[in-house]
């Protein structure tokens, strides 16, 4: 049997897998167990009572976290004219049309979010096989296809989380860094859950938010007592 690391022993000793933790207790424990040399991301996994195989039960959208996500987000925008200048002024790192598409086709992918104005989708549509598998294809449901590219850029820079229910009805997302104050992580999680509740499909029956689990990059998953959240 492989020897357990000091971190693994601490997790085994302090984590009760059968327990639901209040959000405050969960964050405190994750902070206590975080001893790596980088700022771990705090991730949330939410099990929804949906069947994502049914077209009327897809859950997809975006939430702007009130305290950001602690990441330096690089943005590419497909647009032209005055919109292009406005996107640059808002902080977008890459702005263009056909020339930007050519760079992406050539393998230049140094960005985290892609935004497009509606008139640019004729160009972006050619990149589906490149952007789609990476989860970067602009979509109106996530606010990344919009005539208001300035707001979209600002939201992306502010730490907007895009979510989409995967197989099994599970949503994954980062809600900040372990170095964040507990109240900031709590309010970020509450913002995400609030938007998920608004996105509940009408055909979804029974319990919608089945399980909420909080974890860090290298840490354990802790099931959250949803009554400890103000949503």
UniProtKB/Swiss-Prot annotation:
One GO CC term, this protein: cytosolic large ribosomal subunit
UniProt cross-references to PROSITE patterns, sorted A to Z: RIBOSOMAL_L1 (PS01199)
Keywords: Repressor, Ribonucleoprotein, Ribosomal protein, RNA-binding, rRNA-binding, Translation regulation, tRNA-binding
Listed GO biological process terms: regulation of translation; translation
Superkingdom field: Bacteria
GO molecular function: rRNA binding; structural constituent of ribosome; tRNA binding
Oligomer status and interactors: Part of the 50S ribosomal subunit.
Entry's family note: Belongs to the universal ribosomal protein uL1 family.
Biological role stated in the UniProt entry: Binds directly to 23S rRNA. The L1 stalk is quite mobile in the ribosome, and is involved in E site tRNA release. Protein L1 is also a translational repressor protein, it controls the translation of the L11 operon by binding to its mRNA.
UniProt-recorded name of the protein: Large ribosomal subunit protein uL1
């Amino acid at each position: 049997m492989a020897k357990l690391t000091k971190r693994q022993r601490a997790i085994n000793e302090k984590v009760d897998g059968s327990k639901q933790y209040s959000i405050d207790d969960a964050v405190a424990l994750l902070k206590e167990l975080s001893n790596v040399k980088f700022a771990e991301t705090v991730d949330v996994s939410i099990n929804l009572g949906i069947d994502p195989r049914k077209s009327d039960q897809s859950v997809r959208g975006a939430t702007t976290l009130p305290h950001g996500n602690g990441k330096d987000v690089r943005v590419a925008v497909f647009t032209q004219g005055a919109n292009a200048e406005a996107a640059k002024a808002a902080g977008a790192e890459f702005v263009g049309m056909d020339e930007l598409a050519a760079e992406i086709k050539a393998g230049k992918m140094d960005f985290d979010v892609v935004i497009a104005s509606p008139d640019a989708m004729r160009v972006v549509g050619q990149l589906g096989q490149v952007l789609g598998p990476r989860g970067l294809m602009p979509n109106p449901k996530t606010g990344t296809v919009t005539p208001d590219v300035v707001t979209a850029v600002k939201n992306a820079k502010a730490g907007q989380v895009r979510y989409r229910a995967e197989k099994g009805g599970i949503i994954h997302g980062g809600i900040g860094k372990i170095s964040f104050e507990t109240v900031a992580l709590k309010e970020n999680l509450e913002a995400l859950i609030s938007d998920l509740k608004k996105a509940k499909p009408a055909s979804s029956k029974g319990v919608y938010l089945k399980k909420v689990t909080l974890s860090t990059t290298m840490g354990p998953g802790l099931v959250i007592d949803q009554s400890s959240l103000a949503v």
